[in-house]
Amino acid sequence: MEFDKLYRQYDYLKKLKSVLYYQGAVTHEILGNLTEILKDRITNQKGKNKILNVFVEMVQNVSHYSLEKEGSYGIGLILVKEKNHILKLSTANLLSEETASTLEKKLDHFLSLSEAEVKELYLQKIKGERPKSSKGAGLGFLEILRKSDFPFRSSFEKTPNGNFFFTLTVFFRLE
């Protein structure tokens, strides 16, 4: 029985053309190891640094903000796929209703901004104080938006227990 489940998962991930798949706690060591794996798999030398920077930012968000924890580390899912010369980075984790609501408004606002407005807001945040609720400088999603080749996509799906399953997907050209 276990074989059937594993084979179905294997076959599914193979069809997805996944480059990297991880589900579990995101420790500093795991982040470092996943980054090294991705670094070895990216053949586009020109865009490698920005892809890796965005990947690290996305995975740190899972570690810091996931509602599910293993010790002090967040639990989530990380998936990297490649198709038609596009690299797709996706992360997913659970959020509380309050966090999901706040984050959804923030991301919608960021996506409504022009490139110049994103740059201006980014510079303001660099010069400003660190937000109290942030584990960083509050720049993460702006960094992701600035460095990715296309606008990111996000979704917030309510789970049966009232929390939200948050997914973030970012795209890069590989040519």
Where do the model's predicted regions map?
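Conserved beta-strand-loop-beta-strand hairpin that lines the nucleotide-binding pocket
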Residues: 3-20, 65-175
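STAS-typified acidic loop motif
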Residues: 18-32
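Conserved short strand/loop->alpha-helix "switch" segment adjacent to the catalytic nucleotide/phosphoryl-transfer site
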Residues: 34-56, 129-134
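Short, glycine/charge-rich beta-strand/loop segments that flank catalytic centers
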Residues: 54-57, 75-77
